[in-house]
From Swiss-Prot:
Entry coiled-coil feature ranges: 14-53
Family: Belongs to the AAA ATPase family.
Keyword Cytoplasm: yes
Region of interest: Docks into pockets in the proteasome alpha-ring to cause gate opening: 391-393
Self-association state and partner proteins as the record states: Homohexamer. The hexameric complex has a two-ring architecture resembling a top hat that caps the 20S proteasome core at one or both ends. Upon ATP-binding, the C-terminus of PAN interacts with the alpha-rings of the proteasome core by binding to the intersubunit pockets.
Record's protein name: Proteasome-activating nucleotidase
Presence of the UniProt keyword Translocase in the record: no
Length: 393
């Protein structure tokens, strides 16, 4: 009889242990649920506070008064003298900074981040250009000059301070299309570990009065913030042509944009970590004001490649391709007299297409010779069309 009682007692004891475990698990799950509900409640409280809080008024700081108060221009209209909230660092309050005022417009509650024009923002190339000097053929002298003027001041400005001279602020690259001006600018940005800001000068020509000058100003401000940086202005003749008094509103706007560019070139220190490189095909039409000392001090010609240069360029492109062993680079260079670097690249691409059409996986010497002939015909046709336009225009 006693044995049956012990069995019943053991069974009830094990049931109690199991029940306790179940209750503990239930408590844990309820605690987790309470924590999740508390987070959700805090989230909705924060959202309610955002919806119920009054909007702030944007203003621009005009001046900081001796007593610590600030003169601002409110977006709602008048200029106001306001106080600064105690949680804001007084050092951040400077003329030109955007701030947020409370609804009454009596106190600065927040310093707003600096605005960037979307047009200016898209000019920055976030990824470093993947171009090196070894990928540029026949321009050793130009590379040497560019490194002295741009790369050396960015990497070792103390050398110029020690010797007591200022390096040139800007470099102007000029020469026929396709000779490697853009590649030179990208290569020096790569080697200098600088932010590369690429802009075509025609982007400065805007529809509304003053917009072009504002974009130029904001471009230079962004370059200073992102320093070390290189601004590359391609086709600068679009805004830098000689000024003539036509009197049209569009011409006046371009002249205002040019004046702003000249002011920016005059306004920064050559030893700041910002360098300007400009490129043009038409140096003959540039305004003399751009070329005067203190602006584009170093003017570098980027000519069509000579025989040795064409050989180097062919070698650079062909070593990346699958070609037969009997390629004669010297002969290719002789046949491509007058070709630019871009023309030679087109020759290599066209030769590859010829091999693909024939079902081959290697480019032959014959493909390259035929490609040179084809590109030459296109160039001659373009030149004859240009002559006809000039004749009948």
């Amino acid at each position: 009889m006693s044995g049956d009682f012990d069995t019943i007692r053991d069974a009830s004891s094990s049931d109690e242990v199991q029940l306790v475990r179940l209750l503990e698990e239930k408590i844990k799950s309820l605690q987790i649920e309470i924590e999740n509900l508390r987070k959700e409640l805090n989230y909705y409280k924060a959202e309610m506070e955002k919806m119920l809080s009054p909007p702030l008024i944007e203003a621009v700081v005009l001046d900081v008064l001796p007593d610590g108060r600030v003169l601002v221009r409110s977006s709602s209209g008048p200029n106001l003298v306001v106080n600064v909230a105690s949680h804001i660092d007084q050092k951040l309050i400077k003329p030109g900074v955007s701030v947020a005022l409370n609804q009454r417009g009596s106190t600065i509650l927040e310093v707003l981040p600096q605005k960037e024009d979307p047009i200016v923002k898209t000019m920055e190339i976030v990824e470093k250009p993947n171009v090196t000097y070894s990928e540029i053929g026949g321009l050793e002298e130009q590379i040497k000059e560019l490194r002295e003027v741009v790369e050396l001041p960015l990497k070792k400005p103390e050398i110029f301070r020690e010797i007591g001279v200022e390096p040139p602020k800007g470099v102007l690259l000029y020469g026929p299309p396709g000779t490697g001006k853009t590649m030179l600018a990208k290569a020096v940005a790569t080697e200098s570990n600088a932010v590369f800001i690429h802009v075509v000068a025609s982007e400065f020509a805007q529809k509304f009065v003053g917009e072009g000058a504002r974009i130029v100003r904001e471009l230079f401000e962004m370059a200073k913030r992102k320093a070390p940086s290189i601004i590359f202005i391609d086709e600068i003749d679009a805004i830098g042509a000689k000024r003539i008094d036509i009197g049209t509103s569009g011409e006046r706007e371009i002249q205002r944009t040019l004046m702003q560019l000249l002011a920016e070139l005059d306004g920064f220190n050559p030893l700041d970590n910002v360098k300007i490189i400009a490129a043009t095909n038409r140096i003959d039409i540039l305004d003399p004001a751009l070329l005067r000392p203190g602006r584009f001090d170093r003017i570098i010609e980027v000519p069509l490649p000579d025989f040795r240069g064409r050989t180097e360029i062919f070698n650079i492109y062909l070593k990346k391709m699958k070609v037969e062993d009997n390629i004669n680079l010297e002969l290719l260079s002789q046949l491509s007299e007058g070709f630019s670097g871009a023309d030679i690249k087109n020759v290599c691409v066209e030769a590859a297409y010829m091999a693909i059409r024939d079902g081959r996986n290697k480019v032959t010497m014959k493909d390259l010779v035929n490609a040179i002939t084809k590109i030459n015909v296109k160039r001659n046709n373009m030149e004859s069309m240009k002559e006809r336009r000039e004749k009948y225009s």
